[in-house]
Curated annotation (Swiss-Prot):
Low complexity: bias regions: 105-133
Biased composition range(s): Polar residues: 86-100
Region listing for Disordered, in residue ranges: 82-133
Name this polypeptide is given: Uncharacterized protein ORF133
Length: 133
């Protein structure tokens, strides 16, 4: 495929790419492996061949136009594509939720009480457990 068609595909998936650098000239020893994926706002593009690259100021620049690639579009789910992410502070709040801890403790207390009720028929073992503690 030509460079124009490739850039049109990147534009279709709304990928962020820079046109300030020419995609030629530099002899670079770096090459991306097969299977690199470029994610955009509306879709993704997977390059299925080895392509020379240059990395400049945190940007990935392709030095050759890939000829073999696949394009996909995200499906709309409930009006949009949503990715759920958890921040460390949010996960800590979920772990330290007092209502969850209380319910677990009350469940444990009831099981302990039930076991104490079964041993309370024998008075000697219950007194032995008190002396051991």
């Amino acid at each position: 495929m030509s460079m124009k068609e490739f850039v049109q595909k990147l534009d279709e998936i709304q990928a962020s790419f820079s046109s300030h650098f020419p995609l030629v000239i530099i002899n670079s020893n770096y090459k991306i492996d097969n299977g690199i994926v470029i994610f955009g706002k509306k879709g993704w593009l997977r390059i299925n061949e080895s392509v020379p690259i240059m990395i400049n100021y945190g940007s990935l620049i392709l030095l050759d136009t890939p000829k073999n690639y696949m394009v996909g579009v995200y499906k709309n789910v409930n009006g949009g594509r949503k990715i759920k992410s958890y921040s460390p502070s949010r996960s800590q709040k979920a772990l330290n939720n007092p209502s969850k801890i209380r319910t677990k403790q009350t469940n444990n207390d009831t099981t302990i009480q039930q076991s104490n009720n079964t041993t309370s028929t024998n008075t000697k073992p219950s007194s032995n457990t008190n002396t051991q503690q």
